């Protein structure tokens, strides 16, 4: 027998898929609960439907085979992408069929976006307000019109094509999801090959994706937007493909195209400076970032990511190995350092998801701030309603993602954490000194809470006593945010030093002039004062409490002094059995539950701060002499320094539009405001409640049914403690978010 040398063995192509692993069976899918042996037997009690929902997507409970779990998650991703593309297609279809997009394009300063017309059933057509240009419909605040203009879409036919393209894409995604689970399913080794994955994600998805987008921006968006900015009628603008096929059209707008690719290969890149610009600031016509700056940015990002994708060792013996990087990463005080983290992240999808959600959530909140400080789309900056809505949207989405990160970190700790792998590494060391971490964090929360709230209480008291000279304010005892002001000045001065070719600062929010578009403020310096200093410390307080709850849930998910064997009880359990009082509501799930309330609490204050600050100090009109009149007349600095000011001059004053909306086009928001308060109050019935009360009530109702011989075959059961809390928090958040939605919309659509 001949023994091949190892290097010849390695060169064989590896088979990394299984063929036809799982049959496609509609009969199986039609059976409710087919994924769980107990559930598949059908319902005995009403708890069955709850467990069906709780476990349908909990792949860990379907099988313990990591390969099968990985395949299910992979297939589910394609399903998710299909749902997203169908949803987007629907939005774009509405834009094509029911909207005033073309009228808005011709006059974006005076026509407001609308993509929904209500049918005249029992008088509901009152909701179709006059949005300008003779169109009546519901004003939308999703920013889609601004995005489409940025893409270079000039008519509804292009929107129809895009909508159909979205559906085709959804079909491809659905097919891919089915194909990669039922026909050619990747093996576990493929899912765990992190270097190839980084290679693909960085280089192909992010790198080539950005490069393709830069191409679209250069060849389609930039020329079309340049013509629209110059006031060329939409019907006279060439169609997107004409710019690509007819080079002379591009050369007329950007002479740099005349030289072709020669400057690229001769490294004479300056010739492309007319369409790859570095202007900084905002386009004075649209109030958005310069399209050519955005193209330049995406080209640079593409280069960075394509290079980054080449860093990792795959089939050739060069490049980084993630395992080696992690295992060599040891500090003087961190024991085994990052050893073991590679195994955690390649065998636990929860660990992977937890880190990704935490990063993505933080990034989403950063995006919320970029959308107003550096509005990327044309005419977004002057559409105040849209600005407020997309800020609020991104803030809340980010909050949910961060709480989800903590949830999956706790699930990782309970289900996937292996103490043998994590010996004296950074994770083990953090868990071992968790008492110090949590007690310090607790102290910080108490300190921040008392001091930040105390400043407000002091001001309320002094104002009530008629002693304004003793208040913390810009006109009495000043507490200026000096570090924030320093950062603002630094950024205003930076373009001359760090980016010598930039013509304007990165964002007028930091400093510079007032940019007005059509007599409305697009952006101007946001001056910070004592009121911002006070509310900033409330933000610090609420964020730290949220972190305290979530981090405690993760660090004590496996064990605590109270329940040393917590890991055996699972991610969610109501109490540690009978006879152990005081062990309720300590599971990982319960910490996520509590964290959600504080996340909502934190972010409500963030969006209130933003809404009032922008209306008071940024948004408004500019007259011919250059004088700015803000929506609420700059009242933030003196009113936002007391609790009473927040209640009276923000909540109550700005609720007048939603409260008085009946009989107007905004009346739906009045009903929503009422209905959402009701949903919120309904949540309290589940949150301030005991399971026994409901079970007792159900028993007597069942007795009455038995008396009348109409007893159901499926036994009614009261919600478990955990189910009741889940229903409670869901309605609390839904009610709170929809109330805020109605409050913000009715006000800003009236005054913005």
Curated annotation (Swiss-Prot):
Q: What is its EC number?
A: 1.97.1.12
Detail which positions bind chlorophyll a: 685, 693
| GO MF entry, a single one | chlorophyll binding
State where the protein is found.
Answer: Cellular thylakoid membrane
Membrane-spanning segments? 73-96, 159-182, 198-222, 294-312, 349-372, 388-414, 436-458, 533-551, 591-612, 666-688, 726-746
Q: Return the Gene3D superfamilies for the record.
A: Photosystem I PsaA/PsaB
Q: Does the keyword Acetylation apply?
A: no
Task: List ligand-binding residues for phylloquinone.
Answer: 694
Chief subcellular site? membrane
Which free-text remark accompanies the cofactor? Answer: PSI electron transfer chain: 5 chlorophyll a, 1 chlorophyll a', 2 phylloquinones and 3 4Fe-4S clusters. PSI core antenna: 90 chlorophyll a, 22 carotenoids, 3 phospholipids and 1 galactolipid. P700 is a chlorophyll a/chlorophyll a' dimer, A0 is one or more chlorophyll a, A1 is one or both phylloquinones and FX is a shared 4Fe-4S iron-sulfur center.
List this protein's GO terms for biological process: photosynthesis
Q: Which residues bind [4Fe-4S] cluster?
A: 575, 584
Q: What are the binding positions for chlorophyll a' in this chain?
A: 677
Q: Entry's InterPro entries?
A: PSI_PsaA, PSI_PsaA/B, PSI_PsaA/B_CS, PSI_PsaA/B_sf
Q: What membrane topology was assigned to this protein in its record?
A: Multi-pass membrane protein
Whether Oxidoreductase counts among this entry's keywords is yes
Q: Which one Pfam family would you cite for this protein?
A: PsaA_PsaB
Q: Which UniProt keywords apply?
A: 4Fe-4S, Chlorophyll, Chromophore, Electron transport, Iron, Iron-sulfur, Magnesium, Membrane, Metal-binding, Oxidoreductase, Photosynthesis, Photosystem I, Thylakoid, Transmembrane, Transmembrane helix, Transport
Subunit comment = The PsaA/B heterodimer binds the P700 chlorophyll special pair and subsequent electron acceptors. PSI consists of a core antenna complex that captures photons, and an electron transfer chain that converts photonic excitation into a charge separation. The cyanobacterial PSI reaction center is composed of one copy each of PsaA,B,C,D,E,F,I,J,K,L,M and X, and forms trimeric complexes.
Protein name (Swiss-Prot/TrEMBL): Photosystem I P700 chlorophyll a apoprotein A1
Origin organism is Nostoc sp. (strain PCC 7120 / SAG 25.82 / UTEX 2576)
> Species lineage, top-down?
Bacteria, Bacillati, Cyanobacteriota, Cyanophyceae, Nostocales
């Amino acid at each position: 027998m001949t023994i091949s040398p190892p290097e010849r063995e390695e060169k064989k192509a590896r088979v990394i898929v299984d063929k036809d692993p799982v049959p496609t069976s509609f009969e199986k899918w039609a059976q409710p609960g087919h994924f769980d042996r107990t559930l598949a037997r059908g319902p005995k009690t009403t708890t069955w439907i709850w467990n069906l929902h709780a476990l349908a997507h909990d792949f860990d409970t379907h099988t313990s085979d990591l390969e099968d779990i990985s395949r299910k998650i992979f297939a589910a991703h394609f399903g998710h992408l299909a749902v997203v593309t169908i949803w987007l297609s629907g939005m774009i279809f509405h834009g094509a069929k029911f909207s005033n997009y073309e009228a808005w394009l011709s006059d974006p300063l005076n026509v407001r976006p609308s993509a929904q017309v209500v049918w005249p059933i029992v008088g509901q057509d009152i909701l179709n307000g006059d949005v300008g240009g003779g169109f009546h419909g519901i004003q939308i605040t999703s920013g889609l019109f601004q995005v489409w203009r940025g893409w270079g879409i000039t008519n509804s036919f292009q929107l129809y094509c895009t909508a159909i393209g979205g559906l085709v894409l959804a079909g491809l995604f659905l097919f891919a999801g089915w194909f990669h689970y039922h026909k050619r399913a990747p093996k576990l080794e493929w899912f765990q090959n992190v270097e190839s994955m980084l290679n693909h994600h960085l280089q192909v998805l992010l790198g080539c994706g950005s490069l393709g987008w830069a191409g679209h921006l250069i060849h389609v968006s930039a020329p079309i937007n340049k013509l629209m900015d110059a006031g060329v009628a939409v019907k006279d603008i060439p169609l997107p493909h004409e710019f690509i096929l007819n080079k002379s059209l591009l050369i007329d707008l950007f002479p740099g195209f005349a030289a072709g690719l020669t400057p690229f290969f001769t490294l004479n890149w300056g010739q492309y400076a007319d369409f790859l610009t570095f202007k900084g600031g905002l386009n004075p016509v649209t109030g958005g970032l310069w399209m050519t700056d955005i193209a330049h940015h995406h080209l640079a990002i593409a280069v960075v990511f394509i290079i980054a994708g080449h860093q990792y060792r795959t089939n050739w013996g060069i490049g980084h190995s993630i395992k080696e990087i992690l295992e060599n990463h040891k500090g003087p005080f961190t024991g085994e350092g990052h050893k073991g983290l590679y195994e955690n992240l390649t065998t636990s999808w929860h660990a992977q998801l937890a880190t990704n959600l935490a990063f993505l959530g933080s990034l989403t909140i950063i995006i919320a701030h970029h959308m107003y400080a550096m509005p990327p789309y044309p005419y977004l900056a002057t559409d105040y309603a849209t600005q407020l809505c997309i800020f609020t949207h991104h803030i809340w989405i980010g909050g949910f993602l961060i709480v989800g990160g903590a949830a999956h970190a706790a699930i990782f700790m309970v289900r996937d954490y292996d103490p043998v792998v994590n010996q004296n590494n950074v994770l083990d060391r953090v868990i071992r000194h968790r008492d110090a971490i949590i007690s310090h964090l607790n102290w910080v929360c108490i300190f921040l809470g008392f001091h930040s709230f105390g400043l407000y209480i002091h001001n309320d008291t002094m104002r009530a006593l008629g002693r304004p000279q003793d208040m913390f304010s810009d006109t009495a005892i000043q507490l200026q945010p000096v570090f924030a002001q320093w950062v603002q000045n630094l950024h205003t001065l930076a373009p001359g030093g760090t980016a010598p070719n930039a013509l304007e600062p990165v964002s007028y929010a930091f400093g510079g002039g007032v940019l007005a578009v059509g007599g409305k403020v697009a952006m101007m310096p946001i001056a910070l004062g004592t009121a911002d200093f006070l509310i900033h410390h409330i933000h610090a307080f609420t964020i730290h409490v949220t972190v305290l709850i979530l981090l405690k849930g993760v660090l004590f998910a496996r064990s605590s002094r109270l329940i040393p064997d917590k890991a055996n009880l699972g991610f969610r359990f109501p109490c540690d059995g009978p006879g152990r009082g005081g062990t309720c509501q300590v599971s990982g799930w319960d910490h996520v539950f509590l964290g959600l309330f504080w996340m909502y609490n934190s972010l409500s204050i963030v969006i209130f701060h933003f809404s009032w600050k922008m209306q008071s100090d940024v948004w408004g009109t500019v007259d011919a002499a250059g004088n700015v009149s803000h929506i609420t007349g700059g009242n933030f600095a003196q009113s936002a320094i007391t609790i009473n000011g927040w209640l009276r001059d923000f909540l109550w004053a700005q609720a007048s539009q939603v409260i008085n909306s009946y009989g107007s086009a905004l009346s739906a928001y009045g009903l929503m405001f009422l209905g959402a308060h009701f949903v919120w109050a309904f949540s309290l019935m589940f949150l301030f409640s005991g399971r026994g009360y409901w079970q007792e009530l159900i028993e007597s109702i069942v007795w009455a049914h038995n008396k009348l011989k109409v007893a159901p075959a499926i036994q009614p059961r009261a919600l478990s403690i955990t189910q009741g809390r889940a229903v409670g928090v869901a309605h609390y958040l839904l009610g709170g978010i929809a109330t805020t939605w109605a409050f913000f919309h009715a006000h800003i659509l009236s005054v913005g």
